[in-house]
Design a protein with these regions (language model features):
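Flexible, glycine/threonine-enriched loop-and-boundary segments that flank and lead into catalytic domains
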Residues: 10-33, 71, 121-122, 132-137, ...
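C-terminal helix of von Willebrand factor
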Residues: 206-233
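Negatively charged sequence features
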Residues: 1-44, 49-56, 84
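Von Willebrand factor
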Residues: 95-99, 103-148, 190-198
Length: 233
């Protein structure tokens, strides 16, 4: 209802994705009565910004453009719903340094400064996914929420210059995911790699990932996926 005390998460996310796609959504059902107590939830979104994201999807844009739009819509949606969240980007060139782009901390409000950081992201280097997950998990583990979701957005397999491709990268990433779970975190991977089903079950388990086969759909689907993952939380 339009004058409710709390925004309806599912309704708002659908409204926001429709608006992003140029469809005029119905704002009349966005609100609902606030449940007793706020959601005790924290989410950290970790985005792969490696050079492979410079690949063109079609004549309308590149993978990095879909990632940028996803971060914009994700940020707008979660800021409106009131859930606590942070956003990081990462890429790598061998073990050190792993480049970490601080897009939004948990303490920062979502606004013009954060939008500017999202706009400024650029692809570069490689995907040392295990290191990225460990860094993000360390930050998320500091949060005191009862549910802590680590949402990982990537476009392909772990890879780097120092033989990190293949079994080494896969096993390092699997160990990083296990370490995160032992800290009480909930890692979940969102990939646009059409071959993701070949290796992601080994890394995240059968229910720990989703493959989005059309990269252009990523901005609209990511907030809705978040709503499903956090339903009731």
């Amino acid at each position: 209802r339009p004058d409710g005390e709390a925004i309806d998460l599912d309704a708002y996310l659908r409204f926001a994705t429709d608006r992003h796609a140029g469809v005029q959504g119905d704002a009349s059902r966005l609100y609902r009565q606030m449940r007793s107590g706020a959601r005790d939830l924290a989410c950290l979104l970790l985005a792969d910004l490696s050079l492979s994201t410079d690949t063109w999807i079609d004549d309308r844009g590149r993978v990095i453009d879909a990632i940028r739009d996803s971060l914009f819509l994700f940020g707008e949606s979660l800021a409106a719903t009131g859930d606590r969240f942070a956003m990081l980007g990462f890429s790598s060139r061998r073990r050190d340094p792993v480049r970490v782009h601080q897009i939004k901390t948990f303490a920062e409000p979502y606004g013009a400064v954060i939008r500017g950081r999202i706009q400024a992201i650029k692809p570069g280097y490689y995907t040392r996914l295990g290191a990225g997950i460990r860094h993000a998990a360390q930050r998320l583990a500091r949060e005191g929420a009862s549910r802590r979701l680590l949402l990982i957005l990537t476009d392909g397999k772990p890879n780097d210059l120092d033989r990190y491709e293949g079994r080494w990268g896969i096993e390092d990433t699997r160990h990083a995911v296990g370490e995160a779970r032992r800290q009480g975190l909930e890692p979940f991977c969102v990939t646009i790699d059409p071959e993701g089903n070949d290796y992601l079950p080994h890394l995240f388990g059968s229910g720990g990932y989703v493959v989005i086969r059309h990269p252009a759909e990523l901005p609209a689907r990511l907030p809705l996926l978040y709503a499903r993952l956090t339903a009731g939380g």
